[in-house]
Amino acid sequence: MAVEDFEAVLKAKYPGKAHAKRVVDLIRKTKPDANGVIYLEGRMTKLLEDNDSPEHFRQRRYFYYLTGCNLADCSFAYDIQSSKSILFIPPIDPDDVIWSGLPLSIDEALSRYDVDEVKFTTEVNSTLAHLAKQSPNSTVFAIANQVSDSVTFLEFGSKDFETVKKAIEVSRVVKDEFEVAMIRKANHISSLAHKAVIERSKAAATEQELYATFLERCVSHAAPEMAYHPILAAGKAAATLHYVDNNAPLKGKQNLLIDAGCEWNNYASDITRTFPLTGTFTKESRDIYDIVLRMQKECTELIKGGMLWDDLHLHAHKVAIDGLLALGILKGDAKEILNARTSAAFFPHGLGHHLGMDTHDTGGNPNPNDPDKLFRYLRLRGHVPAGAVVTVEPGIYFCDFIIKPYLDDHVHSKYIDAAVLNKYWDVGGVRIEDNIHVTENGYVNLTTAIKEVSDVEAVSAK
């Protein structure tokens, strides 16, 4: 999809009403006679501790999914019987106007958001009471600990604080066209920022200079919010999976691993690239990069709706083992190495996860207590449906803290050639990550950041 294509999709309103209907359908799968009101609150303004300034605002994702509204201090009601949606926005506070200007009006909100009616938040209780009386013994569906003390549900026959949250989490797994366009736009901007970082790398002296370059490019494209704290790790720091210091000097380091992505209207991108700081990969870095790129490409090609993610993760380990055997870092029989789980010393994390409004989006069903260390940190388990967006992010790392216990354990050390391994410590780590839209019979790669060796070296050498 070209830039103009996803921009055309994004000219429409965020499809909050369609999402609400999907959520109701899911609620009725477990509660066929469900009737009443869905009530959700957005993020309320909260001051910093010991300060009179507000905390950085991040909208509640459950609320946003049904409204597309990114304003603070709002509420939402959806009448299940009539399919009527009502957005509540804060009334004008004259004392606040002098500082912040006029807030969105009711007419402006009705024009901007996919709702049937807009009211002020001062009308929440009276509106809920009216809706409750329309259907005797109706239920209000809300989320526990996300209802203001001033809101009352006394008129409803029953209260349910669990079902709607679970239904929204299930609904969020399969993305519609608008959501995919949001993720694609976030990817487009982030891919431009990744390229800008590579272009800047030869002139930069520290990680934070490249960090600033990434932020600048995203902000200049109207995407100031990061989906997560960016990782810019030079040299051996790349062996730390979630390195966040971003302040070390670049001199004398082989590569830089950058894991960074912006949001577009609350939808995330999550991209990782590794590139040479000298313009050309060293032999050892190229060895590892080629293995990781093969891991990523082969796993991506296996993606289609309904596939079991565990199988894909297992395939990534098989490719890693083959590559490390060819280099001599591993030795012995590939099947024995896999069964011993020795490859987890070099590829300790999961292959990927769901992506959406959260970087680690809903629906992953991880099992952190899995006795099998190969799957313990896999954030996505089970079959992946068509319509989901996932990350594919294999990596190979040389982390002394992780690898040393394997070298000290005969079960694993017999498969590792320490002399060959010693040549690769300075590589640090290599990870390559793209965002993939799963289709019925295949996939669409939403990430356009360069990753072929010839392209990466050509840009980094400039």
Swiss-Prot record:
What does this gene product do? Catalyzes the removal of a penultimate prolyl residue from the N-termini of peptides.
Q: Which cofactor does it need?
A: Mn(2+)
Say if the entry is tagged with keyword Signal. no
Keywords of the record, alphabetical order, are:
Aminopeptidase, Hydrolase, Manganese, Metal-binding, Metalloprotease, Protease
Free-text cofactor note: Binds 2 manganese ions per subunit.
Catalytic activity annotated for this protein?
Release of any N-terminal amino acid, including proline, that is linked to proline, even from a dipeptide or tripeptide
- Give the UniProt family note: Belongs to the peptidase M24B family.
- Tell whether ATP-binding is among the UniProt keywords: no
Pfam annotation, one family: Peptidase_M24
Q: Which Gene3D superfamilies match?
A: Creatinase/methionine aminopeptidase superfamily (3.90.230.10), Creatinase/prolidase N-terminal domain (3.40.350.10)
Write the Enzyme Commission number(s) for this entry. Answer: 3.4.11.9
Superkingdom of this protein's organism: Eukaryota
The UniProt annotation places Mn(2+) 1 binding at D270, E393, E433
SMART domains xrefs? AMP_N
Which residues hold Mn(2+) 2? Answer: D259, D270, E433
Q: Which GO terms describe its biological process?
A: proteolysis
Q: Which organism encodes this protein?
A: Metarhizium robertsii (strain ARSEF 23 / ATCC MYA-3075) (Metarhizium anisopliae (strain ARSEF 23))
Name the record gives this protein: Probable Xaa-Pro aminopeptidase pepP
GO MF terms, alphabetically ordered? manganese ion binding; metalloaminopeptidase activity
Question: What PANTHER family does its record include?
Answer: XAA-PRO AMINOPEPTIDASE 3 (PTHR43226), XAA-PRO DIPEPTIDASE (PTHR43226:SF1)
